[in-house]
C-alpha cells in the first residue's frame, strides 16, 4: 500500500502543470497596463504569470508577441463592450455617444483594473527601439477614432446628423476627449469627475454638432 502511494506521488510530481493562456494574458495585461511596455521586464512577466520563460516564449515567441496578445485581450474584454453602445440603433446619436463615454468612464475607473486606457497609458515613454510597439499603439489610437467616425458616418447617411456637419472633425474632437479622460483617470480622478466631463460634453452637444460644419 505504501509503495503504491509513493508511486502515485512520484507520478503526480512528474506531471507538468497545464499552462493557462487566458490567466497568463490577464496578468500580463495588468502589468503592461500599469507599467507600460518598457517598464515591464520578462522577469516581471514570469513572476506574475507563474510560467517559466521557455513556456512564454513557446506560446508568444517573445515579449513583443506577448504584448500584442495582451493588447488583443484588452480589445476583446473592454473595447468591444464599450463599442456596443454605438451599435444600438434604437438610440439617438446623442444617447449612443453618451452611452459610449459612460461605459468608457466606467472602464477607466474600474477598481479591478489599472486606471485609464490601455493604449494611451502604454504609449507613453516609448524609446526609439520600440518603434514596432509604437506603431501598433498608433494603429489602435486611429482605430478608436475610426470607430467613432464609422458611427457618425452611418448616422449621417441615415439622416440623423445634418449633411453639412463635418463628422471627421467631430470624431477627432471626441477622440481627444477620450484621451483627456484617460489622463485624468490615470492621475487618480474618480468616476464622478469623468461623469462630470461627460455631462458638460452632452450639454454642449447641440452647439458642438452645429459648429462642426464642413468648410465650403
Regions found by a protein language model. Give the residues of each.
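Amphipathic C-terminal alpha-helical segment
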Residues: 107-110, 150, 154, 174-191, ...
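Helix-turn-helix
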Residues: 2, 23, 27, 31-65, ...
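Amphipathic alpha-helical segments used for helix-helix packing
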Residues: 95-97, 110-135
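Hydrophobic alpha-helical segments that form the core
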Residues: 115, 120, 163-184, 197-204
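N-terminal intrinsically disordered/low-complexity leader segments
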Residues: 1-19, 211-216
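Recognition helices and adjacent regulatory flanks at domain boundaries
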Residues: 16-18, 29, 33-35, 43-48, ...
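Hydrophobic alpha-helical connector segments
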Residues: 69, 83-115, 167, 171-174, ...
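Amphipathic alpha-helical packing segments from all-alpha helical-bundle domains
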Residues: 76-79, 91, 95-99, 131-157, ...
Amino acid at each position: 500500500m505504501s509503495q503504491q502511494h509513493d508511486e502515485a506521488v512520484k507520478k503526480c510530481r512528474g506531471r507538468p502543470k497545464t499552462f493557462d493562456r487566458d490567466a497568463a494574458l490577464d496578468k500580463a495585461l495588468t502589468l503592461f497596463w500599469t507599467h507600460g511596455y518598457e517598464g515591464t521586464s520578462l522577469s516581471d512577466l514570469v513572476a506574475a504569470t507563474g510560467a517559466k520563460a521557455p513556456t512564454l516564449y513557446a506560446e508568444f515567441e517573445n515579449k513583443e508577441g506577448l504584448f500584442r496578445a495582451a493588447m488583443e485581450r484588452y480589445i476583446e474584454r473592454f473595447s468591444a463592450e464599450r463599442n456596443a453602445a454605438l451599435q444600438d440603433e434604437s438610440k439617438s446619436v446623442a444617447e449612443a455617444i453618451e452611452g459610449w463615454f459612460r461605459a468608457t468612464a466606467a472602464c477607466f475607473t474600474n477598481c479591478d483594473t489599472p486606471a485609464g486606457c490601455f493604449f494611451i497609458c502604454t504609449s507613453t515613454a516609448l524609446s526609439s527601439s520600440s518603434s514596432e510597439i509604437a506603431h501598433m499603439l498608433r494603429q489602435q489610437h486611429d482605430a478608436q477614432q475610426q470607430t467613432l467616425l464609422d458611427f457618425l458616418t452611418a448616422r449621417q447617411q441615415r439622416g440623423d446628423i445634418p449633411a453639412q456637419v463635418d463628422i471627421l472633425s467631430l470624431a477627432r474632437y471626441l477622440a481627444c476627449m477620450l484621451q483627456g479622460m484617460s489622463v485624468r483617470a490615470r492621475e487618480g480622478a474618480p468616476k464622478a469627475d469623468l461623469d462630470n466631463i461627460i455631462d458638460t460634453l452632452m450639454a454642449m452637444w447641440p452647439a458642438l454638432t452645429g459648429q462642426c460644419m464642413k468648410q465650403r
